Amino acid sequence: WGTLETHDFQAALVAGLERAFPEDPPTFMVSVPHGYADTVIVVADLRTGGLDAVRVESVTLEGHAASAADLAAGYCAGTPLRPAIEARGDLSSTTAVVAQEMEARLGTGAVKGSMTAHVIEAVPT
């Protein structure tokens, strides 16, 4: 995946989580999907592991959702964020705060946002 800044939906999600839990926001999105986004580091790690990266391509696509509220519900209840949210507070009220922040950033009604991933092809050295 690309950095958090290259994923509009998840950047809005993280902003909502930071608003809901300013002292201790869940860090799953920052540390797991977006925590290994530097292709220079990934390629170096591949070389250390005995692979040679023969192609590195960053792909940006546009995601679509019926609403920011639907995105908030899906992320909060249907990802590894859920137990982290429930350990800090109420799932329903947190989802509402996250939805408000996501709507402020993405708009109301149907939403779209960019998302970037890195595709790396590697072969044994």
Stretches found by the model and what they are:
Residues 1-25, 39, 68, 72:
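Conserved class I S-adenosyl-L-methionine
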Residues 30-125:
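Conserved Class I S-adenosyl-L-methionine
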